[in-house]
Amino acid sequence: MKLKIREGTISDDELCGAIMLGALVSADIPRSFLKDDVLILPLRSNLRFIAFYDQTPAGFCDYSVSKSHINYLFVDPLFQASGVGTFLLENVQRRLETPISVNVLCRNEKAILWYLKKDFTFTKLWSEQFNGQLTAWLKLTKKTF
């Protein structure tokens, strides 16, 4: 196994959307916001890392330096539990060097447990409209290493 990482660009929007879609399907997260089962994830003003497992795109992380916040961290289901998510998280932590936050859907128990295992702590719970329904979210925060 050889994990590599590179900076992502807007040319990776479709790739990241495909990885995110695969992970959402795997976690049985509603995807009513999709049109024709296609997701293009715009980079906007975020920074992005793309992880490769033996030269195959395996995951990505979009994050904000100014907010010290992970906007998205998704791993292709074929590569979950192989260290890709940890690899992405560690690279973001080294880049930010400040406490990091992430918002996770409460129904995504697998992701919540993963972040808690990585020493994130519960910061906030709230509900807001998402996909046309009231949805519960958790904010998790981690001090840097």
Where are these regions (language model features)?
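Conserved N-terminal entry element of GNAT/NAT acetyltransferase domains
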Residues: M1-S11, L140-F145
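Acetyl-CoA-dependent GNAT
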Residues: E7-L78, L89-N91, R95
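Short hydrophobic/aromatic beta-strand or adjacent loop that forms the aromatic wall/cage
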Residues: N46, Q133-K139
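Active-site acidic-Proline motif in GNAT/NAT acetyltransferases
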Residues: D76-S82, C106-R107
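Conserved acetyl-CoA-binding loop-helix of GNAT-fold acetyltransferases
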Residues: A81-R94, L113, K117
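Short glycine/proline-centered loop/turn elements that form peptide/ligand docking sites
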Residues: G85, L89, R107-A111, E128-L134
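Conserved acetyl-CoA-binding loop of GNAT-fold acetyltransferases
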Residues: L116-L125
